[in-house]
C-alpha cells in the first residue's frame, strides 16, 4: 500500500477517535458532602447571600462612621460675576447697580455629630477673597481663623440615639441571616442531589424491569406453545414489556432534567455527567425541642428581626411626637478679620458671635400632628400583634420540625427494611411465576411494591437530611459538633 494511503487511513482513524471522545461525557462521582461544599462556594444562591451580607456590612460601617469626626474642605476657585442686581438707596428707593467682580474662598471644617443630644458641633476656619473688576479695582480679604458652631434641636427626635439602638440589631440580623441562608443553600443542594439520585435509581429500576419483562415474555411465549398458560397472560406480559419501555424513556428524560438542574446549581460544566453516591453515614442526633427553641431564639435572625421591628415602631412614635413642636438652637463663636491684604485680615481680629433660637409651633393644624401620633401608635400596636403571631408560628413550626426529625430515623429504618423485603419478595415471585404457581397480576403487584419500596427508601433518606439541615438553619447550631454555626464575617466580606 502506498504511503499516502497509510497517512489518509491514519488521519481518518484519529478523526473518528477524536469525535468519539468529544461525544463521551466525563463521569464524575459526587457525594452529598462534595455537592454541599461546591454549592456553598460556587452557586448563585451563595453569591446572592454573600453580596447581601456585604451590603449590610458596609451599611453598618457607614452608620459607625457617622458617629466619628468628619473633616471637610470646600472651596470656590474661582468665582466670577458680571451682572445687575437691585440695590436700595438711602431714600428707600431701589435702583440697579452693576457688579463685576471675581471671588475665591476656602473653608476647612471638622464636624462631629453628638449622638447623646442629636446635635452637631463644628470647628471651622475659612478665608475669602474678592476683587472688583470695575472702578478702583479694590481687593479685600476676610478671614475666620477659628469658629465653633453648634446646631441643636430641642424637642425633635434624636435620630442618632435611635440609630445606636437599631443599627447594631440590624447588623446582627444580617449576619445571622447570612448563616441561615448558607444552610438554606445546603437544603437546596440536598433537594437537587436527591432528585438526581432518585431519577438515576428510577432509570436503573426501569432498565431492570424491562430486562425482566422481556425475559418473562420470552418464557411465556414458549409456555404458550406448550399450552401451559393462557393467551391473556402472554398479552399481559407483552403489555408489560411495552409499559417498561415507555417508563424507561420517561425516566431517562427525568434523569437528564435532574442532572441539568444540579449541574447548573453547582456551576459545573455541561460536559460532566454526575453520578450521585447514596449517603450511608447519618448523623446520630436526637433533638430536644426546648433546647432547639432556646438556640433558635438566641442565634436565628428571626429574633433580631423581631427586636428591630419593635424598635423601629417605637422610633416612629417618638418621631411623630417630636413633630408636635420644633425648636432649634444655633450658636457660633469665633473671630474674624478683613483687610486689603491677607496678613491684615488676621490681625487685628474681631469677635464673631451668632446666637439664634428658631421655634416652630403649629397654632391651628386641625389635629393633623396629633393624628400622626395616633397613627404611629396604632401602627405599633398592629406590628406588635403581628410579631406575637409570627413568634407563635415560629415556635409551632420548630416544634413540628423537631418531631419530624426525631421520628425520621425510625421511618428510614422501616423504609430500608421494607425495601429489602420487597426486593426479596419480587425475586421469589419471579421464580414462582416461572413454575406457574402465580398469575401475572401477582407478579405485577410484586414489581410495583418493589419499585415503590425502593423509591420510599430514598425519599425517607432525603427527608432525614433535609430536616437535619433545616434544624441547623433555624437554630444555627451544629448538632454533631455541639457548637454554634459561626463564621469570620470580616474575612468573608473582605475577600
Language-model-derived ranges and their functions:
Residues 30, 164-295, 404, 408, ...:
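Periplasmic alpha-helical coiled-coil/stalk elements that build and connect Gram-negative outer-membrane
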Residues 23-36:
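Regulatory alphaC helix of protein kinase catalytic domains
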Residues 1-26:
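Bacterial Sec-dependent N-terminal signal peptides
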Residues 45, 163, 233, 302, ...:
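DHp/HisKA histidine-phosphotransfer helix
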Residues 160, 164, 366-369, 373:
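Interdomain signal-transducing alpha-helical coiled-coil linkers
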Residues 48-63, 181, 185-206, 215-217, ...:
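Amphipathic alpha-helical coiled-coil segments
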Residues 40-155, 268, 293-371, 396, ...:
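A small-residue-enriched
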Residues 20-25, 72, 79-81, 270, ...:
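Acidic, low-complexity, intrinsically disordered peripheral segments
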